[in-house]
């Protein structure tokens, strides 16, 4: 029996190792849905409640597994809804393929129902976006879309007219140049190493440095051993960009933790005072936290040549896989005898840890968000995957939930979209059924895509969702005050009873509002997850500010201005 065009697409995905697709059915994509039904023993379809979630799940799938993430939506509004999640994938370098429906091929661009030229709409978010022109076209574009997404860690897109999906594929109607079997499914993984002369130039810079700091990002997640070996040889503290949180365990004596507004003071001091910087797999966007231009000699390792020199004036760019490049560089490095720079960073970390301890040990009510983050961090298994949403909760996640060896952590690092935490966690749990998967979210971000709790219940996922409930868009509130000097405005949220919401969806809900009971209730929640999703409503102090590691004079001035100009919580904040 002849295959349909949709069958060719689905079987191409299977051959590329795709076994999971996230999405929502619709009349514009039902031909592909029928093929997924007939192939469901080889590829599973995860039905979500909003297409944005499908794209975020595909992004998280790619991040956590290293495989191609795939999302699917119908024509028009379905495809449009994918965009936010796809931009998250684009900006964090995740390999994602989006498949969307279209109207009948001979009615496109005629103002018919759901007639949106998604192939053109997706041209910015996707490096390859195409429209299927006929059933014999599918095999070619599917191969290119999969290969491009995987090879370049980018987003690709195929838009599929609804009538062509059901058409039979026939070699008789193929063009003479579309020779059968001319495509290949072989994926040549990059084995790229920098030129040896560049490696030696990089080694010369690192060997002559006196105060060397390493900045590690997402591209170093698989290079932990090599990263630590280089740090030990150079006596260099390792500073971690947000997406590089798991690149080095936080109990390593070489790391000073994160950098930026969510980072640590020792990390900021290390970058401010270093004379040599080694950047590994990062395009950390907050340039103001890097060494002043001209202060440090720099070497950068990145798989993408476009990222070399993007954030800092590096002397040597090493294009290649971070682990293999570090391993090639290691024999060229000399053992540093002077430990003073590293020792200083380690002593500062001890002081920083004492400061954190003071904050997470505070038993006052309302409960401080640092308490729930710290107590959760103590209870995570060695195989835990923690996905964080965007907001003040990101600060507590970054500083108070330490990364242990074997754990995974991720968030929307560059787009910093709200609502990603729950979809990320669902994807992680589906990818790794035996691992503990936690969502650490704020009430603002959670409510944007809270319908996905029903998805977690439907698929009986043992996830735990920790909601930091402060009834406010906290990050925006403090940005208004500290960065602009304005009183808060339009940031209060209507309170929601998340325990009742969880129960209405068929999940377990647990409220924590007393810091003295926090640990025991967390134990109960984590144990209850064996039966399905658990929602923890952690009621916290809305006036606990996610302050930068080092407050600048301008920030302090702006904060004072906001109080003087009518900040409604001025009395409580001052007291």
Regions found by a protein language model. Give the residues of each.
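N-terminal alpha/beta PP-like core and its mobile active-site loop of ThDP/TPP-dependent enzymes
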Residues: 1-337, 379-382, 455, 462-467, ...
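Thiamine diphosphate
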Residues: 99, 107-114, 261, 309-311, ...
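Phosphate/pyrophosphate-binding active-site segments
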Residues: 136, 172, 182-185, 189, ...
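Acidic active-site catalytic centers that drive phospho-/nucleotidyl reactions
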Residues: 51, 275, 302, 389, ...
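Active-site diphosphate/adenylate-binding microenvironment
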Residues: 9-10, 14, 27, 32-37, ...
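Charged, low-complexity, helix-prone segments enriched in Lys/Glu/Asp/Gln
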Residues: 61, 80, 340-361, 428, ...
């Amino acid at each position: 029996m002849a295959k349909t065009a949709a069958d060719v697409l689905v079987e191409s995905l299977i051959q590329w190792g795709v076994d999971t697709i996230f999405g929502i059915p619709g009349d514009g994509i039902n031909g592909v849905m029928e093929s997924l039904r007939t192939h469901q023993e080889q590829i599973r379809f995860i039905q979500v409640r909003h297409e944005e979630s499908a794209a975020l799940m595909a992004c998280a799938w790619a991040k956590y597994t290293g495989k191609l993430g795939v999302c699917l939506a119908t024509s028009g509004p379905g495809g449009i809804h994918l965009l936010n999640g796809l931009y998250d994938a684009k900006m964090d370098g995740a390999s994602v393929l989006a498949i969307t429906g279209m109207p009948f091929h001979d009615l496109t661009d005629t103002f018919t129902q759901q007639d949106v030229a998604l192939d053109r709409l997706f041209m910015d978010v996707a490096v390859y976006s195409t429209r299927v022109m006929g059933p014999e076209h599918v095999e070619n574009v599917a191969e290119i879309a999969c290969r491009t997404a995987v090879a370049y860690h980018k987003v690709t897109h195929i838009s599929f007219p609804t009538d062509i999906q059901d058409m039979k594929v026939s070699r008789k109607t193929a063009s003479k140049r579309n020779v059968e079997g001319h495509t290949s499914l072989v994926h040549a993984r990059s084995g790229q190493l920098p030129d040896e002369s560049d490696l030696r130039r990089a080694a010369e810079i690192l060997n002559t440095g006196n105060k060397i700091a390493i900045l590690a990002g997402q591209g170093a997640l698989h290079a932990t051993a090599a990263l630590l070996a280089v740090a030990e040889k150079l006596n260099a503290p390792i500073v971690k960009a947000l997406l590089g949180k798991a690149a080095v365990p936080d109990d390593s004596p070489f790391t000073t933790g994160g950098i930026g507004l969510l980072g640590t003071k020792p990390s900021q001091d290390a970058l401010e005072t270093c004379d040599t910087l080694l950047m590994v797999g990062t395009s950390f966007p907050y340039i103001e936290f890097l060494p002043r231009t001209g202060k440090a000699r720099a070497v950068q390792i990145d798989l993408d040549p476009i990222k070399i020199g993007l954030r800092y004036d590096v002397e040597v760019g090493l294009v290649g896989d971070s682990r293999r490049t570090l391993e090639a560089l290691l024999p060229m490095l000399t053992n540093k005898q002077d430990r003073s720079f590293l020792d200083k960073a380690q002593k500062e970390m001890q002081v920083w840890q004492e400061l954190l301890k003071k904050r997470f040990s505070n038993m006052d009510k309302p409960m401080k968000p640092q308490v729930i983050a710290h107590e959760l961090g103590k209870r995570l298994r060695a195989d835990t995957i923690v996905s964080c949403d965007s907001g003040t909760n990101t600060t507590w996640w970054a500083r108070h939930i330490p990364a242990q060896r074997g754990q995974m952590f991720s968030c929307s690092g560059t787009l910093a979209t709200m609502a990603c935490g729950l979809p990320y966690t669902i994807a992680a749990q589906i990818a790794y059924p035996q691992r503990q998967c936690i969502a650490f979210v704020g009430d603002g971000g959670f409510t944007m895509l809270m319908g996905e709790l029903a998805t977690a219940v439907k698929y009986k996922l043992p996830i735990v969702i920790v909601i930091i409930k402060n009834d406010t868009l906290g990050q925006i509130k403090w940005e208004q005050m500290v960065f602009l000097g304005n009183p808060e405005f339009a940031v209060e949220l209507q309170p929601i009873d998340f325990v009742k919401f969880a129960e209405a969806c068929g999940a377990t809900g647990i409220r924590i509002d007393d810091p003295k009971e926090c640990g025991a209730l967390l134990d109960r929640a984590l144990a209850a997850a064996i039966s399905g999703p658990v929602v923890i409503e952690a009621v916290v102090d809305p006036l606990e500010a996610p302050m930068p590691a080092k407050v600048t004079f301008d920030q302090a001035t702006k904060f004072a201005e906001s109080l003087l100009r009518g900040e409604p919580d001025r009395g409580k904040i001052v007291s």
